[in-house]
Amino acid sequence: MSLAAYCVICCRRMGTSTPPPKSSTYWRDIRNIIKFTGSLILGGSLFITYEVLALKKSLTLDTQVIEREKMKSYIYVHTVSLDKTENHGITYQARKELHKAVRKVLATSARIFRGPFADTFSTVDIEDHDCAVWLLLRKSRSDDRAARLQAVQEMSEARHWHDYQYRIIAQACDMRTLTGLARSKDSDLRFFLRPPPLPSLKEDSSTEEELRHLLASLPQTDLDECIQCFTALALSESSQSLAAQKGGLWCFGGNGLPYAESFGEVPSATVEMFCLEALVKHSEIPTHCDKIEANGGLQLLQRLYQLHKDCPKVQRNIMRILGNMALNEHLHSTIVRSGWVSILAEAIKSQHIMEASHAARTLANLDRETVPDKYHDGVYVLHPQYRTSQPIKADVLFIHGLMGAAFKTWRQQDNDQDLTEKVSEDETKYTTCWPKSWLARDCPALRIISVEYDTSLSDWRARCPTERKSIAFRSNELLRKLRAAGVGDRPVVWVSHSMGGLLVKKMLLEASKRPEMNTIINNTRGIIFYSVPHHGSHLAEYSVNIRYLLFPSLEVKELSKDSPALKTLQDDFLEFAKDKNFQVLSFVETLPTYIGSMIKLHVVPLDSADLGLGDLIPVDVNHLNICKPKKKDAFLYQRTLQFIRDALAKDLEN
């Protein structure tokens, strides 16, 4: 109305008034009309907009409670604001829109070319990464093995997901995918849920008593004599009686000869440790593994693992039991459901090589998707411990001596600094296992295996059958385990120290007599001997008291200078090696080894280390350090590396 009145007044003025002296008056009035009209329209628009927004706000319900319910609260650890504007900027929104556009293009292309496209989520308004998560989960269950492997690899490489998206996969993935993620080097630990709560112990019970009950529930008849002994000791009435029964006997674990410096000291044993050692032996029998699982052994072992985080020896024995149980595929689902994969996924990333290697063995036995081989107790893969796209072209096997170990025998040479301090140092300064730290980097196409044969039976030597400790028995047992691990399917180089070299010779001789083992003979490319007593050792003759403390009696007889068994082994091996196309390299010590503060002995002299084949290189070190290079560019390591590369040159080139 006001606008119409104003226009009428203006028209009357123009009609009744005399003509203006200037034409500018007319245009000034027009401009005033336009200004007034524009202001009126703009003000009205703002008012109407405000009223509409106010009305919409008053009619909108608060859905915060509903949104909270939609969050993955049961697995989402750290909550975030529901206001998307707080979390996502322009860059995120642009990337999101770009991803949507790409997905539409791919879907269109798939329709045009009639190709496969998972369009399950193409019409659903969800987060871009949520779509990727569910697509990967669907892909991980594909019937195509290559697609499953690719899905696991893509999951392990994810770095941009939210916390709840990792938890979605942890909650929704199957056993095969979870194991694959645990064996993927770059996997985020958020893929693995915490193990389920452990059942409460019975009233007035303890882990020690539960272990005894578990051990007592296992079959006690038709067992090996040594397993019966282990079980009887573990079921003794008290830890004091265990220590008394163990009294003064020697344990051949760890570093070997250095322990001889403390003849009068005997490690104190606990009931739990004895029970675990007995369970290790029982777990080598498949039917006993079923009993352990049925009687709650997996949960009990997990409780012990958590209670003894500061005791590596306890944890290693638990891992050995678990690795043995994982050899039985029908137990895989139970092992995964019990939460062990989460623990193993963390352990395999440990900086401590022994802990990581034990976890790697168990996970490899669980991973039937990519690992056809089975790793029995005492067979440890040092490289590769994760899934890898690197083709493995050859195997290098490390066999320690009688008083050695699968890891410590192959450590870097010790200095005056304490070994426990070295472990915490940077790996470039000191390594506790040079085959894993050095050789794996220099030759990534190798599978590196370290073997440990069971010498702990020497603790109860009076009750165990003597043939178990013979070179023949040990070699047959190791040969069986190595063949199960796929040794012989690829070219092989053997690396041995001390008595380990005698075992290698005996294994090759035994393999040559069995048609099913011929692949090991045909694929052997070379052997390295570090101070191997081919013709016996003076250590066995030095002193009756010392020799029985250092070696079980049968080993003393077999390692005696010019013993009949040793001579037969040497002659048979030379005859066997005549027409075989493999290389041989021998190192020998030139310095005596100190045993105690007043005794020093040249353990393997030059003439005993001479096999009669290949090169023999004297090195100015003692018997313990002959297989422990001082550093990576030391002669010992560089010559070993050169030999391995030369022996496998043709195989590594292919």
Swiss-Prot record:
InterPro entries hit by this protein: AB_hydrolase_fold, ARM-like, ARM-type_fold, SERAC1
Record family assignment: Belongs to the SERAC1 family.
GO BP of this protein: phospholipid biosynthetic process
UniProt main location, coarse: mitochondrion
GO cellular component terms, A-Z: endoplasmic reticulum; membrane; mitochondrion
Topology class, membrane: Single-pass membrane protein
Species per Swiss-Prot/TrEMBL record: Bos taurus
Name of the protein in its database record: Protein SERAC1
